[in-house]
Amino acid sequence: MATATTTTATESPSNSGRRQARYLCLTILGYRKPGMSEEDYRNHMVNVSAPLTKDLMVKYGVKRWTQIHNQSETKALMSQLFDPQMCNLADYDCFSQVVFENIEDYKRMKQDPWYKKHLVGDHENFADTKRSQMTIGWVEEFVRDGQVVEGFKG
């Protein structure tokens, strides 16, 4: 029988010897619902889903939430960056990243009655939930606002 693992932000030493928190980042590699235009998808995520979601995320300790919309216009820019090492273009429509300290907080948010009532069903309005993928990992930050930094600050 498998056992569940609880993961929280951990302290790790920085180059200066200070202890700093490590944060988790849930990345959702999203596809839009079949038949939906890129702009309708972006509009729903930015103007419908985000306003419904952001206060709930704050309530449960989310430190940062971003959406990166990968539309035809920006996909075309990739041709300027291709080289032998960077030549495979991702076809996802959006990358949504949620940063938090404690996975239990995120799990509690998903159990919130408001989340279940308003957000679970909303995903079916714009997302291809069968094709979209997810991953989670530790955040390592090196540059913020044009400045070198020693790790992510929540």
Curated annotation (Swiss-Prot):
Disulfide-bond pairs as recorded: none
One MF term in the entry's GO annotations: oxidoreductase activity
Top enzyme category: lyase
Gene expressing this chain: claH
Enzyme Commission number: 4.1.1.-
SUPFAM superfamilies: Dimeric alpha+beta barrel (SSF54909)
Pathway: Pigment biosynthesis
Note in the entry: Contrary to the other identified cladofulvin biosynthesis genes, claH is not locatilzed in the cladofulvin cluster, but is co-regulated with the cluster genes.
Coiled-coil intervals, chain numbering: none
Catalyzed reaction equations: atrochrysone carboxylate + H(+) = atrochrysone + CO2
Membership in a protein family: Belongs to the tpcK family.
Function per UniProt: Decarboxylase involved in the biosynthesis of the bianthraquinone cladofulvin, a conidial pigment not required for virulence but that plays a role in fitness and resistance to environmental stresses including UV light and low-temperature stress. The pathway begins with the synthesis of atrochrysone thioester by the polyketide synthase (PKS) claG. The atrochrysone carboxyl ACP thioesterase claF then breaks the thioester bond and releases the atrochrysone carboxylic acid from claG.
Domain of life: Eukaryota
Protein name as annotated: Decarboxylase claH
Swiss-Prot/TrEMBL keywords: Lyase
Organism expressing this protein natively: Passalora fulva (Tomato leaf mold)
Inducing stimuli: Expression is positively regulated by the transcriptional regulator wor1. Expression is down-regulated during biotrophic growth within tomato leaves.
Stretch forming the signal peptide: none
